[in-house]
Structures are given as C-alpha cells and as structure tokens.
C-alpha cells in the first residue's frame, strides 16, 4: 500500500468515517513530504472528504487541489452545545452522500475529538446509548475518554 498512515488514524465507522491528527503532522512545522505521503495513503483508503476542526483553514487549499471535498468547523477549547449541534449536523450531512468517506481531524487527537465522535454516534441515532458510544470510542482509540470528552456526549 502506497503512502504513509497518518498518526492516530482510526475508522470510527468502517469505510465511512475516520479520524486522525492533522495530515502532515501536528504543530507549527508540518512536513510537506509527510503531508503528501499521508494524502496518498488516505486516498488509497477511499477517503474523499476532509472535515477540519482546526482553528485555521490550514491545508484546506492543499486538500481541495488534490480532489478532496473539504469542511471547516473551527473548534474552540470550550465547546458550547450550540456549536456541537452544528458540527454534528454538518458531519451527518456530509455522510448523507453514500459515496462520501470522511476523515475528521484536528491538530492532535485531543480530549474534544473523541467526545465529538461519540456524540455524533448518538446525535445521528446510529447508537441510542451514550455509555455504549463512549465504550466503543474507547475501544477503537485504545484509551479512556477524558471527563471533558465524556461531557460532549449527549445524555451522559
């Protein structure tokens, strides 16, 4: 398989919704060659859309130039419920296209991202049990969700 798998890449919904840290690496000095290798790998997985939770529009133009559909929803450190619902709805709408395979990323796979993903599973009614959503994310990511992440899951 060509390319380089991004750090913290995991399928949340196999073949449909994935997560990773920022393509090309996190921090102030992402590497162009690494970004290109990771894009090649992501494309080999069939992913055709990037959903960025970064504060800036960093890399969005690069993603568009190589054919990705892009979404950008900057995420503050303290996420208000109104913002969560907007993000959940945007993910749901993006995934309503049966051909769309979406990668969600932020600089790092921090506390908020797992909570948003578990919350999306509840919001979209793919699951109806917040405890199960939390457990599934913990199993996929191989780490416990923080209290901050758990607080982002509806009905917990």
Describe the role of every protein-language-model region:
Residues 110-116:
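Glycine-rich nucleophile elbow surrounding the catalytic serine of serine-hydrolase chemistry
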Residues 1-103, 116-156:
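Cys-dependent protein tyrosine phosphatase-like superfamily
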């Amino acid at each position: 398989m060509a390319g380089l798998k991004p750090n913290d890449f995991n399928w949340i919904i196999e073949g449909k919704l994935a997560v990773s840290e920022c393509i090309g690496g996190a921090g102030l000095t992402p590497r162009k060659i690494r970004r290109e290798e990771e894009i090649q790998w992501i494309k080999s997985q069939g992913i055709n859309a990037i959903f960025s939770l970064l504060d800036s529009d960093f890399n969005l133009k690069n993603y568009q130039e190589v054919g990705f559909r892009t979404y950008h929803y900057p995420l503050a450190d303290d996420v208000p419920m109104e913002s969560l619902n907007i993000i959940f709805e945007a993910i749901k709408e993006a995934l309503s296209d049966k051909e769309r395979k979406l990668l969600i990323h932020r600089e790092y796979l921090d506390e908020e991202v797992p909570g948003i993903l578990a919350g999306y599973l509840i919001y979209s009614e793919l699951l109806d049990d917040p405890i199960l959503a939390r457990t599934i994310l913990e199993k996929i990511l191989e780490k416990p969700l923080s209290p901050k992440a758990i607080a982002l899951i509806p009905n917990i």
